[in-house]
């Protein structure tokens, strides 16, 4: 059976800590979408680990880790991550169906961002997915056969010829790209496997599989705040498509949310707080992107968005992260509905334009940091937790009270 860990905001919810906290109980941990535009930060024994492509189970020696087919892979960045760990042989596997991000993709991404202003990381994620959908991409499995790779590269060079100058690729692009693959393919090829068959077999054997997503539900290409979204499907449903596991294999869906809201990049954010309180949340919560170091926009918890995300993912339980960041705040707001042109909205619309938050205010608490038992939380903190649980209609199974793995309340 497989369990899914999915972000139910705009990403950066703390999925890495949760996966790291529970990964020891699983045989496989699988990253199922996105690219190195996303990042997990894990604090283990006082040491901070920033992961961009590697599944969070790499810190457990007995855990097998898979990068599955819907992930787009920068071989350079993956090689750099691999070099930071030891003994990954027979513990890390990259799907032969996953698509390869080329240096050209990053150049195209940066070029398009100048006019579109979406707020992308300019890592080449979107253009790589474009080539995938156009059936012209290079897959990880192509790196295993020099002849096939050469054919794919020649087709790529022909396709981009009209755009080389616009994207600033330079006269030596073809030579440089061949050298690029020569440098990194040798390092990455031992990890490339048919992970789809591997996971199907593992599921049939009854092995435990944990599927972790990147970004968050509200960035989903189809169901998020379009066009300010990522280029992949970020919901729990995409875990099946990417891994080859059928929907019957899914057991628990754990939705991850912060006790407040953040968003990086452009796009609508109804509960954003543009006052010094937003700055306080950013500073205390260390809200800076793992990948880009960009400051995250901060605001209050949005229950309209949270209910929507829980429904989309079929969440069976929630993990409430960073409760301690709200410590010491006298009045804590929660967005319970939107108002748009005089109309109250309680359902999440396809377009958030002109949506203003309707807040309910709660009394704050002094301290929750480091608490590991529910009964040790102050009454106001417990009331806040129970209100969220009641309004969303999904059990909160875990509360995080600091970045440390052990500072976790299990309910």
Curated annotation (Swiss-Prot):
Lineage start: Bacteria, Pseudomonadati, Campylobacterota, Epsilonproteobacteria, Campylobacterales
This protein's record includes keyword Nucleotide-binding: yes
Source organism superkingdom: Bacteria
Keyword list, A-Z: Cytoplasm, GTP-binding, Ligase, Magnesium, Metal-binding, Nucleotide-binding, Purine biosynthesis
GO biological process: 'de novo' AMP biosynthetic process; IMP metabolic process
Binding-site list for IMP: 12-15, 37-40, 121, 135, 215, 230, 294
InterPro entries: Adenylosuccin_syn_GTP-bd, Adenylosuccin_syn_Lys_AS, Adenylosuccinate_synth_dom1, Adenylosuccinate_synth_dom2, Adenylosuccinate_synth_dom3, Adenylosuccinate_synthetase, P-loop_NTPase
Residues binding GTP, per UniProt: 11-17, 39-41, 296, 322-324, 400-402
Binding of Mg(2+), residues: 12, 39
Descriptive protein name: Adenylosuccinate synthetase
Family affiliation: Belongs to the adenylosuccinate synthetase family.
Pathway: Purine metabolism; AMP biosynthesis via de novo pathway; AMP from IMP: step 1/2
Cell compartment(s), UniProt: Cytoplasm
Cofactors required: Mg(2+)
PANTHER family xref list: ADENYLOSUCCINATE SYNTHETASE (PTHR11846:SF0)
One Gene Ontology molecular-function label: magnesium ion binding
Role according to the record: Plays an important role in the de novo pathway of purine nucleotide biosynthesis. Catalyzes the first committed step in the biosynthesis of AMP from IMP.
Positions annotated to bind substrate: 290-296
Assembly and oligomerization: Homodimer.
CDD domains linked to this entry: AdSS
Xref: Pfam families: Adenylsucc_synt (PF00709)
This enzyme's EC code(s): 6.3.4.4
Known catalytic reactions: IMP + L-aspartate + GTP = N(6)-(1,2-dicarboxyethyl)-AMP + GDP + phosphate + 2 H(+)
GO CC entries: cytoplasm
